[in-house]
């Protein structure tokens, strides 16, 4: 526990942090990667270049300083980050490295004096221990469960299939032929790739797109403009190639009784965790209403269309609505899609305000914000909305 004097000192630095903004974390990351370049094998350097990770860390530091007297308010964020950390195989000793560079950054940018540095050192130590303990629990659970493992495990690509103009799916089986760990629908895999064309090892996380079967995993990857890993997987990876995976992780997953109505709402490649949820609902013989709402650019970018329709038909109360932002001439209204333009939900208010319905959202942040605002305006309680951001977390 932190004493009141330490808490007061940390809180007194909040205005300075807010004024500095993400320049603080830019300095931190530049310093850390200069002194500990081996950490480039863990961090997504694309997120460093576009500033997303720097912004996310800055927001996390400010949130911690603001809530330092109420750590319970941070527990959802701690769980989300701990799940990501364990997929990256973060170890306890790496927290010491991060802490050293954080304090050095504060000193180099602000020269706040030893009392402030000592207070932040204590505060960081408390938070680091929270993460270390939670991550240790996750590691033990992952390793000891049926089919589980620690670290990474080699898998073979047994099927590679183009699902749309921008999305390709990969089915992966363990090279040792042994069982693999089950997962919650909506969770993701971390894939570790080393290639001669890469400056560093690259780790990416991709949602699982099927229900657990104990034998294989399936992910789907969107080709990103200038994406290092997505470009490699689309253009270079072949069936028979070996990749290394961490066990499934993630705090965004379907967890409702079979009599609870659910809406699965996605934009673009955000449908991938929803697809895993849909297959699981079928596997569980879900009896309540299931709404599938999806927005795509057009028919060429719309993936898994037949699979979704066939899976939905096996559910007793399934309905779906598809939006194409800019339909092509070959896209058939009423068959390929039902609405054009953005996902406007007013016409579906009767279906969406079903009592006790839960809503799962995934897609671009602006898409999820747009949808969430509409749902909240309908009077839907915020606690019934669940969402996942691909990449560094942002508030919807």
Curated annotation (Swiss-Prot):
The keyword Signal does not apply. SUPFAM superfamilies: Ferredoxin reductase-like, C-terminal NADP-linked domain, Globin-like, Riboflavin synthase domain-like. The record marks 29 as: Involved in heme-bound ligand stabilization and O-O bond activation. GO terms for biological process: cellular response to nitrosative stress; nitric oxide catabolic process; response to toxic substance. It catalyses: 2 nitric oxide + NADPH + 2 O2 = 2 nitrate + NADP(+) + H(+); 2 nitric oxide + NADH + 2 O2 = 2 nitrate + NAD(+) + H(+). Keywords: Detoxification, FAD, Flavoprotein, Heme, Iron, Metal-binding, NAD, NADP, Oxidoreductase, Oxygen transport, Transport. FAD binds at residues 188, 204-207, 389-392. Residues 150-255 form the FAD-binding FR-type domain. Residues 1-136 form the Globin domain. NADP(+) binds at residues 268-273. Its EC number is 1.14.12.17. Binds 1 heme b (iron(II)-protoporphyrin IX) group per subunit. Its cofactor is heme b; FAD. The active site is at 95 (charge relay system), 135 (charge relay system). It is an enzyme of class 1 (oxidoreductase). InterPro entries: Cbr1-like_FAD-bd_dom (IPR008333), FAD-bd_FR_type (IPR017927), FNR_nucleotide-bd (IPR039261), Globin (IPR000971), Globin-like_sf (IPR009050), Globin/Proto (IPR012292), Hmp (IPR023950), OxRdtase_FAD/NAD-bd (IPR001433). Belongs to the globin family. Two-domain flavohemoproteins subfamily. Consists of two distinct domains; an N-terminal heme-containing oxygen-binding domain and a C-terminal reductase domain with binding sites for FAD and NAD(P)H. Is involved in NO detoxification in an aerobic process, termed nitric oxide dioxygenase (NOD) reaction that utilizes O(2) and NAD(P)H to convert NO to nitrate, which protects the bacterium from various noxious nitrogen compounds. Therefore, plays a central role in the inducible response to nitrosative stress. This is Flavohemoprotein. It comes from Pectobacterium atrosepticum (strain SCRI 1043 / ATCC BAA-672) (Erwinia carotovora subsp. atroseptica). The lineage of its organism: Bacteria, Pseudomonadati, Pseudomonadota, Gammaproteobacteria, Enterobacterales.
């Amino acid at each position: 526990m932190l004493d009141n004097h330490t808490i007061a000192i940390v809180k007194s630095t909040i205005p300075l942090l807010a004024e500095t903004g993400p320049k603080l974390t830019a300095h931190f990351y530049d310093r850390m990667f200069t002194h500990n370049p081996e950490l480039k094998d863990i961090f997504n350097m694309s997120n460093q270049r576009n500033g997303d990770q720097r912004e996310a860390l800055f927001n996390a530091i400010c949130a911690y300083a603001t809530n330092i007297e109420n750590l319970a308010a941070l527990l959802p964020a701690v769980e989300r980050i701990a799940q990501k950390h364990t997929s990256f195989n973060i170890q306890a000793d790496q927290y010491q490295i991060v802490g050293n560079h954080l304090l050095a950054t504060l000193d180099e940018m602000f020269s706040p004096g030893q009392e402030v540095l000592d207070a932040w050192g204590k505060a960081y130590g408390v938070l680091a221990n929270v993460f270390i303990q939670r991550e240790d629990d996750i590691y033990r659970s992952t390793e000891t469960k049926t089919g589980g493992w620690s670290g990474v495990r080699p898998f073979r690509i047994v099927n590679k299939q183009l699902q749309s103009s921008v999305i390709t799916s990969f089915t992966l089986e363990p090279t040792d032929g042994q069982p693999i760990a089950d997962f919650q629908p909506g969770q993701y895999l971390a894939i570790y790739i080393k290639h001669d064309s890469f400056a560093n090892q690259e780790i990416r996380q991709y949602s699982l797109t099927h229900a657990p079967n104990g034998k294989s995993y399936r992910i789907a990857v969107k080709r990103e403009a200038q994406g290092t890993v997505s470009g490699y997987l689309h253009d270079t990876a072949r069936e028979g190639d070996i990749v290394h995976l961490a066990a499934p992780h993630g705090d965004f997953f379907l967890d409702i009784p079979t009599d609870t109505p659910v809406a699965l709402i996605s934009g673009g490649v955000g449908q991938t965790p929803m697809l895993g949820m849909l297959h699981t609902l079928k596997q569980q013989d879900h009896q309540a209403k299931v709404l599938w709402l999806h927005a795509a650019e057009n028919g060429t970018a719309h993936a898994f269309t037949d699979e979704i329709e066939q899976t939905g038909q096996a559910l007793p109360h399934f309905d779906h609505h598809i939006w194409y932002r800019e339909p092509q001439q070959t896209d058939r209204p009423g068959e390929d899609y039902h609405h054009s333009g953005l996902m406007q939900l007013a016409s579906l208010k009767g279906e969406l305000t079903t009592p006790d319905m839960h809503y799962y959202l995934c897609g671009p942040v602006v898409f999820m914000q747009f949808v969430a605002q509409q749902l909240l305006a309908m009077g839907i309680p915020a606690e019934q909305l669940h969402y996942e951001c691909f990449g560094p977390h942002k508030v919807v």
